[in-house]
Amino acid sequence: MATNHLVLSGTITRSRSFKSPAGIAHSVIMLEHKSQCFEAEMLRNVYCQMQVIFSGERFESVTEQLKSGVDIEVQGFIALQQSRNGQNRLVLHAENVELKT
């Protein structure tokens, strides 16, 4: 079996919540990550933005707290998502979230 598990921390820059036609609650955020890591014995600045999707009842208790400016650590799996205009991007589907602020 292949492994697909990502842990990423950062600051929420955008958030929105909605229910699917099937009645499933979803929250979608944009997570901004900044850090420094060593690569080839050199310190490198790392920056990325990733869309994170929280789905289902288990996240309803934290949905109100997932607002712009909040620091979180999220664990989950990544998947390819195609937008309406046909562009592909990786998104993180949350399995666990920890509020840092």
Curated annotation (Swiss-Prot):
One of its GO terms (molecular function) is single-stranded DNA binding. One of its GO terms (cellular component) is primosome complex. The keyword DNA-binding applies. Residues 1-101 form the SSB domain. GO terms for biological process: DNA replication, synthesis of primer. PROSITE patterns: SSB. It holds the Pfam family SSB_1. InterPro entries: NA-bd_OB-fold, Primosome_PriB/ssb, Prisomal_replication_PriB. Keywords: DNA replication, DNA-binding, Primosome. Homodimer. Interacts with PriA and DnaT. Component of the replication restart primosome. Primosome assembly occurs via a 'hand-off' mechanism. PriA binds to replication forks, subsequently PriB then DnaT bind; DnaT then displaces ssDNA to generate the helicase loading substrate. Belongs to the PriB family. HAMAP family: PriB. Involved in the restart of stalled replication forks, which reloads the replicative helicase on sites other than the origin of replication; the PriA-PriB pathway is the major replication restart pathway. During primosome assembly it facilitates complex formation between PriA and DnaT on DNA; stabilizes PriA on DNA. Stimulates the DNA unwinding activity of PriA helicase. This is Replication restart protein PriB. It comes from Shewanella sediminis (strain HAW-EB3).
